[in-house]
């Protein structure tokens, strides 16, 4: 695999090109190729907004043909590693043998999520916004804003402060503090939900951008449910930084007349564009990554029926087996057949959000604030049942009732004997008499399993709550900068930004409240016990 072909520029360079695009209407290299369509052609069938909307959808979780390298860097080698979902087994990349897996963050890998997100998500959003305003279609802008908030929430949760509210206003773009970014998210979601609810109420059967929407096929009710669930996710994210804001935004979600997501949001593999599942490409075609030790411990300890839905059995000897995090790999072949790849096919669709997540979010809101209908236990158990249903496995009732099984000791199946004692004793069965923290650990642990393989979200939740408890990495190459326990907290700002947007990125460092390194906590990362 050649990662060196995925090279991005800084926000300043991209912004300069963006201004040219915005003024002239030309389509630069980052825009979808419309086969030289004229401006008039693109007004037909919403092409001048729909094409940009599809491009945005394709780049929240990167999908398409020949996208595995970008996806690997931006997802699996960041949140995928840091959440414990995956471990690296490749001996060396073009950045060397030590990298994110060892908390040594290569410039190239740190640059890429930042540059790609602005190029492939924010620029199409801006083009769509301009065209939608010309066409006076606020409902289309509302849809795009929901996708934008989803994508940019992932970015800010990697870095902290980011250029956001001023995007499109100049060449050298100032950063917003993460607190301000989140407040902008809430405002945008409020507005989007209001506009879409009005549209849906007036015409429940009407669809928006149906020919370009690969997630819900233009179904407006589903988009409202998704946006409302996303708002609750983000509200809970900030609970340790601003409890009042968290509660206010959560209550808005419960006050919605439409409700929450009930089934998974899935980006389809479609027939309108070239598609290859990047998880399959990275783990099965290239063989670079395998199951992580943390999720191994929980799935095997609980004898979880979802294990074989999530991961393929090891070629040698069967069973579901992970790899300890942060190993220095000398012999990739020792792990290739003895450990488990993710269980996806070449053309498997990409999950954006599990329907089960909405139940776990509501369970936590009920636990914290007694907010919404149902009990904490009923919502927690409904989340597990929804996850089992989504994965097509049986046995949810007996699994939920199990008060004996606990996370297992990690057993290294490669022959390298990197075993480790379990880091948690949390059981599955609900215990109403338990203290708050035990209840929270139970909820977040099951949410962690249900939202697999969304490593970025799992990493964010681990930083917020400390759950599920994880194994510390084996080899830390950060020279004491990043603590192995509790682990890495963020990516440092891209080197490209220091070259191309120096004054603004230096100002952004002051917003962090600490050094620009992987050990400094984000604004919302204020849990006193983690």
Give residue spans per PLM region.
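Sec-dependent bacterial lipoprotein signal peptides
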Residues: 1-22
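Membrane-proximal, proline-rich intrinsically disordered regions
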Residues: 23-84, 468, 480-530
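Extracellular glycan-recognition regions
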Residues: 25-28, 111-113, 462, 467-469
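Short acidic (Asp/Glu) and glycine-rich catalytic loops that position anionic groups and cofactors
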Residues: 32-34, 339-340, 419-424
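Structured, solvent-exposed acidic/aromatic patches
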Residues: 43-47, 89-398, 432-441, 446
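Beta-strand acidic-aromatic groove motif in beta-rich domains, primarily in extracellular
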Residues: 65-75, 161, 247, 455-460
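C-terminal functional modules
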Residues: 395, 399-530
